[in-house]
Amino acid sequence: MQANSVPEFGYIPGGTVNDVARSLGIPNNIRGALKVILTGKNVLLDCMKINDRYAMYIVAAGAFTSATYTTPQAQKKLVGRVAYGIEGIRNNLKFDVFNVKIEGKDAVAESESVLVLFMNGKYVAGMGLNRHASMTDGKIEVAIVRQRPRPNFLHRVGAYFVLAKLFLLGYRVKERRIEKLEGSHFEVTAGEGVVWNFDGERGLSGKVVVDVLPGKVNMIVPARKKDF
Protein backbone atom coordinates (compact mmCIF):
# COMPACT_ATOMS: atom_id res chain seq x y z
CA MET A 1 0.00 0.00 0.00
CA GLN A 2 3.07 2.27 0.13
CA ALA A 3 3.96 1.92 -3.56
CA ASN A 4 4.01 5.06 -5.70
CA SER A 5 2.06 3.34 -8.48
CA VAL A 6 -1.05 1.25 -7.92
CA PRO A 7 -0.65 -2.29 -9.34
CA GLU A 8 -3.37 -3.63 -11.61
CA PHE A 9 -5.42 -6.61 -10.42
CA GLY A 10 -7.54 -9.11 -12.29
CA TYR A 11 -9.88 -11.13 -10.08
CA ILE A 12 -10.69 -14.83 -10.51
CA PRO A 13 -13.19 -15.93 -7.81
CA GLY A 14 -12.14 -19.06 -5.96
CA GLY A 15 -13.97 -18.89 -2.65
CA THR A 16 -17.25 -20.25 -1.33
CA VAL A 17 -19.47 -17.16 -1.68
CA ASN A 18 -17.20 -14.74 -3.61
CA ASP A 19 -18.62 -11.54 -2.15
CA VAL A 20 -16.13 -9.21 -3.88
CA ALA A 21 -16.97 -10.72 -7.27
CA ARG A 22 -20.68 -10.26 -6.59
CA SER A 23 -20.15 -6.64 -5.59
CA LEU A 24 -18.19 -5.92 -8.77
CA GLY A 25 -20.29 -7.97 -11.20
CA ILE A 26 -17.45 -10.40 -11.98
CA PRO A 27 -18.70 -13.87 -13.03
CA ASN A 28 -18.06 -16.73 -10.59
CA ASN A 29 -16.78 -19.04 -13.34
CA ILE A 30 -13.16 -18.97 -14.51
CA ARG A 31 -13.99 -18.43 -18.19
CA GLY A 32 -16.20 -15.43 -17.43
CA ALA A 33 -13.68 -13.92 -15.00
CA LEU A 34 -10.86 -14.27 -17.56
CA LYS A 35 -13.00 -12.54 -20.17
CA VAL A 36 -13.44 -9.60 -17.77
CA ILE A 37 -9.67 -9.41 -17.28
CA LEU A 38 -9.12 -9.31 -21.06
CA THR A 39 -11.95 -6.95 -22.01
CA GLY A 40 -12.81 -5.01 -18.85
CA LYS A 41 -11.99 -1.56 -17.56
CA ASN A 42 -9.99 -0.32 -14.58
CA VAL A 43 -11.60 1.12 -11.45
CA LEU A 44 -9.80 2.39 -8.35
CA LEU A 45 -11.49 0.76 -5.35
CA ASP A 46 -11.26 1.59 -1.67
CA CYS A 47 -9.95 -0.88 0.88
CA MET A 48 -9.65 -0.90 4.67
CA LYS A 49 -6.58 -0.79 6.89
CA ILE A 50 -6.97 -2.35 10.33
CA ASN A 51 -3.94 -1.50 12.47
CA ASP A 52 -1.19 -2.94 10.24
CA ARG A 53 -3.44 -5.36 8.33
CA TYR A 54 -5.76 -4.91 5.34
CA ALA A 55 -9.22 -6.03 4.24
CA MET A 56 -11.15 -5.43 1.06
CA TYR A 57 -14.82 -5.59 1.98
CA ILE A 58 -15.65 -6.77 5.53
CA VAL A 59 -14.31 -6.51 9.07
CA ALA A 60 -16.58 -8.23 11.57
CA ALA A 61 -16.82 -9.67 15.06
CA GLY A 62 -19.50 -11.61 16.90
CA ALA A 63 -22.30 -13.92 15.82
CA PHE A 64 -21.44 -16.34 13.00
CA THR A 65 -18.22 -14.50 12.06
CA SER A 66 -15.92 -17.38 13.02
CA ALA A 67 -17.81 -19.80 10.76
CA THR A 68 -15.91 -18.70 7.63
CA TYR A 69 -12.56 -19.88 9.02
CA THR A 70 -13.70 -22.77 11.27
CA THR A 71 -15.89 -24.58 8.72
CA PRO A 72 -14.08 -27.70 7.40
CA GLN A 73 -13.00 -27.36 3.77
CA ALA A 74 -14.69 -30.65 2.83
CA GLN A 75 -17.99 -29.35 4.19
CA LYS A 76 -17.63 -26.14 2.17
CA LYS A 77 -17.09 -28.11 -1.03
CA LEU A 78 -20.08 -30.35 -0.33
CA VAL A 79 -22.78 -27.79 0.46
CA GLY A 80 -21.22 -24.41 -0.32
CA ARG A 81 -22.32 -21.43 1.73
CA VAL A 82 -24.92 -23.53 3.59
CA ALA A 83 -21.88 -24.95 5.40
CA TYR A 84 -21.32 -21.56 7.02
CA GLY A 85 -24.86 -21.56 8.38
CA ILE A 86 -24.47 -25.07 9.78
CA GLU A 87 -21.17 -24.23 11.45
CA GLY A 88 -22.47 -20.90 12.72
CA ILE A 89 -25.54 -22.42 14.34
CA ARG A 90 -23.49 -25.24 15.83
CA ASN A 91 -21.01 -22.89 17.50
CA ASN A 92 -23.00 -19.70 18.09
CA LEU A 93 -26.46 -20.65 19.33
CA LYS A 94 -26.12 -18.44 22.40
CA PHE A 95 -24.41 -15.47 20.69
CA ASP A 96 -21.67 -14.27 23.04
CA VAL A 97 -22.29 -10.72 24.23
CA PHE A 98 -19.34 -8.32 24.20
CA ASN A 99 -18.82 -4.64 24.91
CA VAL A 100 -17.60 -2.47 22.07
CA LYS A 101 -16.94 1.26 21.77
CA ILE A 102 -16.61 2.74 18.29
CA GLU A 103 -15.39 6.33 17.93
CA GLY A 104 -15.77 8.02 14.57
CA LYS A 105 -15.19 11.60 13.45
CA ASP A 106 -18.78 12.68 14.03
CA ALA A 107 -20.26 10.05 16.35
CA VAL A 108 -19.49 7.62 19.15
CA ALA A 109 -21.32 4.35 19.81
CA GLU A 110 -20.86 2.12 22.83
CA SER A 111 -22.99 -0.87 23.77
CA GLU A 112 -23.15 -4.55 24.55
CA SER A 113 -23.30 -6.29 21.19
CA VAL A 114 -23.65 -9.65 19.47
CA LEU A 115 -22.40 -8.54 16.05
CA VAL A 116 -20.34 -5.66 14.64
CA LEU A 117 -19.79 -5.14 10.91
CA PHE A 118 -17.54 -2.69 9.05
CA MET A 119 -18.61 -2.96 5.41
CA ASN A 120 -16.94 -1.74 2.23
CA GLY A 121 -18.68 -4.13 -0.16
CA LYS A 122 -22.26 -4.69 -1.23
CA TYR A 123 -22.39 -8.39 -0.30
CA VAL A 124 -21.62 -10.24 2.93
CA ALA A 125 -21.88 -14.04 3.16
CA GLY A 126 -23.46 -14.08 -0.29
CA MET A 127 -26.29 -11.77 0.73
CA GLY A 128 -26.91 -8.19 -0.44
CA LEU A 129 -26.54 -6.79 3.05
CA ASN A 130 -25.12 -3.46 1.87
CA ARG A 131 -26.24 -3.37 -1.76
CA HIS A 132 -26.72 0.43 -1.84
CA ALA A 133 -23.12 1.08 -0.79
CA SER A 134 -20.15 2.01 -2.96
CA MET A 135 -16.58 0.73 -2.97
CA THR A 136 -15.36 4.04 -4.41
CA ASP A 137 -16.89 6.66 -2.08
CA GLY A 138 -14.13 6.82 0.55
CA LYS A 139 -16.30 5.62 3.41
CA ILE A 140 -17.57 2.45 5.06
CA GLU A 141 -20.83 1.52 6.75
CA VAL A 142 -20.90 0.18 10.32
CA ALA A 143 -23.69 -1.91 11.84
CA ILE A 144 -23.82 -2.78 15.56
CA VAL A 145 -26.41 -5.32 16.68
CA ARG A 146 -27.05 -4.49 20.33
CA GLN A 147 -27.93 -6.87 23.14
CA ARG A 148 -28.54 -6.71 26.88
CA PRO A 149 -25.50 -7.44 29.10
CA ARG A 150 -27.14 -10.55 30.58
CA PRO A 151 -29.75 -11.66 28.05
CA ASN A 152 -32.41 -14.18 28.98
CA PHE A 153 -33.92 -16.71 26.59
CA LEU A 154 -36.37 -14.22 25.07
CA HIS A 155 -33.62 -11.66 24.51
CA ARG A 156 -31.55 -14.29 22.72
CA VAL A 157 -34.49 -15.28 20.54
CA GLY A 158 -34.98 -11.61 19.76
CA ALA A 159 -31.37 -11.39 18.60
CA TYR A 160 -32.05 -14.09 16.01
CA PHE A 161 -34.89 -12.04 14.54
CA VAL A 162 -32.80 -8.86 14.50
CA LEU A 163 -29.94 -10.63 12.73
CA ALA A 164 -32.38 -12.16 10.25
CA LYS A 165 -33.85 -8.72 9.48
CA LEU A 166 -30.39 -7.27 8.93
CA PHE A 167 -29.22 -10.01 6.56
CA LEU A 168 -32.50 -10.39 4.68
CA LEU A 169 -33.53 -6.74 4.42
CA GLY A 170 -30.11 -5.11 4.43
CA TYR A 171 -28.25 -2.28 6.12
CA ARG A 172 -31.05 0.24 5.60
CA VAL A 173 -33.58 -1.78 7.60
CA LYS A 174 -35.27 0.19 10.37
CA GLU A 175 -34.54 -1.59 13.64
CA ARG A 176 -33.91 0.14 16.98
CA ARG A 177 -31.49 -2.60 18.09
CA ILE A 178 -29.19 -1.95 15.14
CA GLU A 179 -26.98 1.11 15.53
CA LYS A 180 -25.42 2.49 12.35
CA LEU A 181 -22.43 4.70 11.61
CA GLU A 182 -20.69 5.86 8.44
CA GLY A 183 -17.24 7.33 7.98
CA SER A 184 -13.61 6.79 6.99
CA HIS A 185 -11.87 6.46 10.38
CA PHE A 186 -12.94 4.53 13.46
CA GLU A 187 -11.16 3.75 16.72
CA VAL A 188 -12.58 0.57 18.21
CA THR A 189 -12.21 -0.52 21.83
CA ALA A 190 -13.04 -4.15 22.61
CA GLY A 191 -11.77 -6.90 24.89
CA GLU A 192 -9.00 -9.27 23.82
CA GLY A 193 -11.59 -12.03 23.57
CA VAL A 194 -13.22 -10.25 20.63
CA VAL A 195 -11.78 -11.74 17.42
CA TRP A 196 -12.09 -9.79 14.19
CA ASN A 197 -12.80 -11.47 10.86
CA PHE A 198 -11.04 -9.87 7.88
CA ASP A 199 -12.63 -10.86 4.55
CA GLY A 200 -13.50 -14.31 5.87
CA GLU A 201 -10.18 -14.99 7.60
CA ARG A 202 -9.27 -14.76 11.27
CA GLY A 203 -7.69 -11.37 11.90
CA LEU A 204 -6.72 -9.43 15.02
CA SER A 205 -8.22 -9.45 18.51
CA GLY A 206 -9.34 -6.64 20.79
CA LYS A 207 -8.69 -2.97 20.12
CA VAL A 208 -8.32 -1.91 16.48
CA VAL A 209 -8.25 1.22 14.34
CA VAL A 210 -10.11 0.98 11.03
CA ASP A 211 -9.27 3.40 8.21
CA VAL A 212 -10.50 3.66 4.64
CA LEU A 213 -7.75 3.86 2.03
CA PRO A 214 -9.44 5.52 -0.97
CA GLY A 215 -8.66 4.24 -4.46
CA LYS A 216 -5.80 1.94 -3.43
CA VAL A 217 -6.92 -1.15 -5.36
CA ASN A 218 -6.74 -0.92 -9.16
CA MET A 219 -9.20 -3.64 -10.23
CA ILE A 220 -10.27 -4.77 -13.69
CA VAL A 221 -14.08 -4.95 -13.74
CA PRO A 222 -16.74 -5.62 -16.40
CA ALA A 223 -16.68 -2.89 -19.05
CA ARG A 224 -20.42 -2.22 -18.79
CA LYS A 225 -20.55 -2.19 -14.99
CA LYS A 226 -21.29 1.32 -13.68
CA ASP A 227 -22.24 0.92 -10.03
CA PHE A 228 -19.36 0.13 -7.69
Feature-to-residue mapping (PLM):
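ATP/nucleoside-binding phosphotransfer catalytic cores, i.e., glycine-rich phosphate-binding loops
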Residues: G104-D106, E110, S134, I144-F228
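Gly/Ser/Thr-rich active-site loops/lids in small-molecule metabolic enzymes
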Residues: Q75-A83, G128, H132-L154
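Catalytic core of DAGKc-family lipid kinases
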Residues: Q2-L117
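Short acidic/glycine-rich loop or secondary-structure boundary segments that cap or lie
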Residues: T65-A67, E110-S111, V124-M127, R150-L154
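Glycine-rich phosphate/pyrophosphate-binding beta-alpha loops
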Residues: A60, F64, L117-R131, R202
